[in-house]
Amino acid sequence: MDFREILLIASKGQGVNHVPKRYSLAVGPPKKDPKVKGVQSAAVQAFLRRKEEELRQKALEEKKRKEELVKKRIELKHDKKARAMAKRTKDNFHGYDGIPVEEKTKKKQLVESHLNQGTDQEYDVEEEDFIDYNQAELDQDYEEEQEPPKAESKPKAPLKSAPSPMNFTDLLRLAEKKQFEPVEIKVVKKAEDRPLTAEELREREFLERKHRKKKPEPDAKLPPPVLKKAPSHKDIMGTKPSRGAGDRQLASKGLPFPQAEKKFRPSTASEKQAALSSPKSLPGERTKVGSGSSTQPSLREGHNRPVFNGAGKPRPSTCSPSVPKTPASGTQKSASEHKAKKPLPSHPSHSKPGPTVLSHNKSKSPGVRQPGSNSGSAPGQPNPGTARPTLSSGPVPRRQNGSSSSGPEQSAGGIRKLASNSHLSGRTLNGTNGPGRPASSSSGPGRPISGSAGSGRPVGSSGGPGQPVNNPHDLRRPMNSLSSPGRAVSGPGRSISGSIPAGRTVNSGPGRPVSSLGPGRAVSNPGLPTKPRCTVVSETISSKNIISRSSNGQINGMKPLLSGYRSAQGPQRLPFPTGYKRPREYEEDDDDEYDSEMDDFIEDEGEPQEEISKHIREIFGYDRKKYKDESDYALRYMESSWKEQQKEEAKSLRLGMQEDLEEMRREEEELKRRKAKKLKRH
């Protein structure tokens, strides 16, 4: 085909085939990924990428920080070691005798100390609580040590493998579903961190104690802190043998009778009669009162029995030369002693080493005397129960256990007076006999010691020859009647019955000198039976005063006075505590100073309680009704944390500032008003 023909063909078809080009209106295939309604996939992907990046970054930072810390730690360890070695000077100290000293842990020391403690030791309540507390700590530590192995022993649950990552399209679908669902935020309940109230504290304490008691504590056997409750009224009035037995045990153990002062000495007329008749035996030991009206049983109850001091050792009694036998001899029992025994069930005074009571005194309640402290507590012997040495260790052979034969009192022909024996200045009152109790009667404040208990006759040994028993009313003075007010110490050897309750003469007659034979014995008048006077000692006397007094013991080392004399001098008196000053009354000064700022102070004297409450409610928003059920105990011991207190402080500070601002604003307004008034006037 030649070129010319081709051109012709082309020119022919040129107009026919020529169609102008236009943009296509047809919808092409979508260029983007199919969209899921409402979720922008690109945004989600970007978010995920960002998260991954952040996590990677955090992990890197953590790693770096750990490395730095490890480096520092290693340095610190080296430094510490170096410092410790530099400080230590006795690194190689192996004890003075070459045996290395074994350092015991605190826990071991505590346990050992428990084991070493004897059962007969006396503990204060505080000490016992402390040991309980330590024991509880030990138990806790022990439990904590035992718990970790339990935790390890549990088989570990196999770790759940992480779920396989979701496909991206599935993730988008899930997002579409979840996007309108509300997100549940779990509120972590905070344990209420409020301070406990007193009741809750008490309850918790009680439960802890209960829990502690359940665990046996074989190593620490402590004596119960309180040996005996105060006797009930029945116990006081009726003398019961069972009580006596308890006291006997106490005495033998050497424990002091804690309630000694609170027990009273009941006495019955019949007992007095028996006591008085007992002197028939052993004439040598019997002493007649000057008046001869009544003789006193020379035999003390424990006369022929060995007297034990609280610790259980027989205490030798220094019998006077006139009496051939010591109480420990136990050989001669006379009819009088049998008689003396009759009242015994009422109180085992014989078990007490120091019943210096005449046999008619037997009716005293057992607890009255602490072991070894005769009412005149044996001079020169430590009262074992009280653990205080009785001070007047005077040379006079006085009866050391009040229970020794009457003879001791007649020592040296009865010349020596038991004046010092009668509790010089209240020394060696029964151990607990505090300053507030009459010295001579350990039984209770102001009760005469005499066997008749309330009858107002002095017990022989305690009363001293003709010494009046302490003024029963004179609760606060432990001295002999000498020091007790209102009583004249009349003449040598005379006891004036002046303040003795029933108005009775202490000796056979108020004015009569006791014959020198029976120096220590005031003869009780048998014919005057009256009810024992019971006075309760409400206060516990502090041991400080007792000790200070006891140092005075034998009236500053004077020899015991002869029967003719009675020392009414100071040492027998309890020194007045110097630290004590009477509160002065300042009421007179109240009106002197006038404070202008106090004008707006709310004085609620005249107003009823509701008015006051109203004021308080207005000022503080305080409602008394909310707190009316709170006991004083609860309010006093309510627990409060530092945080709570800070809140309260902040609150009160805020209120205070607001009030100050208001005050200032009011003052400014007041000033403005005054200025305005002045301007108006002018």
From Swiss-Prot:
Residues 267-280, 317-334, 371-393, 400-409, 419-432 have a biased composition (Polar residues). This is Protein SPT2 homolog. InterPro entries: Chromatin_SPT2 (IPR013256), SPT2_N (IPR054552). GO terms for biological process: heterochromatin formation; nucleosome assembly; regulation of DNA-templated transcription. It holds the Pfam family SPT2_N. Residues 46-82, 642-682 form a coiled coil. There is a cross-link at residues 37, 186 (Glycyl lysine isopeptide (Lys-Gly) (interchain with G-Cter in SUMO2)). Residues 1-569 are annotated as: Important for interaction with DNA. The acidic C-terminal domain mediates interaction with histone H3/H4 complexes. Residues 80-170, 187-533, 549-595, 641-682 are annotated as: Disordered. The modification Phosphoserine is found at residues 277, 596. The keyword Nucleotidyltransferase does not apply. Residues 673-682 have a biased composition (Basic residues). One of its GO terms (molecular function) is RNA polymerase I core binding. Belongs to the SPT2 family. SMART domains: SPT2. Keywords: Acetylation, Coiled coil, DNA-binding, Isopeptide bond, Nucleus, Phosphoprotein, Transcription, Transcription regulation, Ubl conjugation. The modification N6-acetyllysine is found at residue 581. It is found in: Nucleus, Nucleolus. The keyword Cell membrane does not apply. Its main location: nucleus. Residues 101-111, 187-208, 641-652, 663-672 have a biased composition (Basic and acidic residues).
